[in-house]
A protein has these predicted regions:
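A glycine/proline-hinged amphipathic helix-loop "lid/cap" segment
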Residues: 1-109, 259
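Alpha/beta-hydrolase superfamily serine-hydrolase fold, recognizing
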Residues: 6-15, 19, 92-264
Length: 264
């Protein structure tokens, strides 16, 4: 019932004009460095935060478990996504490390595609989410870019510490090379923690004096465990992802404090 309520509400929310949202919420616009926060996005994030708290799906930093992780992921997958690909997207799970059952999911089209490949890492603070949650994102990328997308189901913290995810990213990159892609054809991409993993992979390749891939695309990346950013002080509360959340993600991602100094 709660999923029906949320989906029904969101179907109405996205057709409301900006003036209607202002009348209904009475929220003021937020400006940061002379840039105005998109009003619809601001209200949407606040509402999603409220829904998550209301239905007991907020990240419990004091008592985190895999059951909570699965509950959060299942909730996200039941929320309707109005932006779905119009073309048929083919999906195939490749086992690229049989010992650890490491999955690399390939998204492709029936029609002729670009010769490039996107190696994609999902977000979630290295602790939550999975390739199933990001299935709509990867599918839309495949259709929009007319390119094969390879989405990695990397190991999550706190069960798996740094550099486990990076090691698996290297395995995925090498798998693409061994299956016909040159480095000039590979694009490394990720969002949030996935963007940090993408950047880490390139730093790791560079440290080993290896040729780098064609391009990296970092979507709102996790950047530094120092969390010393004016934007985080200004926007560190009331926007779903808080400064305390980021402290928690970084803390459980690293194996030891010395990892903060690792260039990867």
């Amino acid at each position: 019932m709660k999923h029906f309520f949320i989906n029904f509400f969101l179907s109405i929310f996205f057709i409301l004009p900006k003036w209607a949202l202002k009348v209904l919420t009475l929220r003021k616009e937020i400006t940061y460095k002379n840039e105005v926060f998109d009003y619809q996005s601001m209200i949407y994030i606040s509402l999603i935060s409220w829904f998550i708290t209301k239905f007991g799906l907020a990240l419990d930093m004091a008592d985190f478990s895999n059951d909570m992780r699965l509950k959060m992921s299942n909730f996200r997958m039941k929320i309707n996504n109005n932006h779905l690909p119009k073309k048929t997207i083919n999906k195939e799970d490749r086992i690229i490390d049989k010992k650890n059952n490491l999955i690399l999911r390939q998204y492709s089209l029936d029609s002729q595609m670009s010769d490039k490949a996107v190696l994609f890492f999902h977000g979630g603070g290295y602790a939550i989410s999975n390739i199933d949650v990001y299935n709509p994102v990867a599918s839309l990328m495949c259709e929009g870019l007319d390119t094969n997308i390879f989405s990695l189901e990397y190991s999550l913290s706190p069960e798996n510490k740094f550099p486990k995810a990076l090691e698996e990213a290297n395995i995925a990159f090498d798998w693409l090379i061994n299956h016909g892609y040159s480095k000039e054809q590979i694009i490394i991409c990720g969002d949030s923690a996935g963007a940090h993993l993408a950047a880490s992979l390139l730093h790791d390749l560079k440290a080993r004096d290896e040729d780098l891939p064609f391009l990296q695309v970092l979507i709102y990346p996790m950047v530094s465990p120092s969390l010393d950013f004016p934007s985080l002080e200004r926007l560190g509360e009331n926007f779903l992802l808080t400064k305390e959340h980021m402290k928690w993600f970084w803390h459980y991602f690293r194996a030891e404090e010395a990892n903060n100094l690792d260039s990867r």
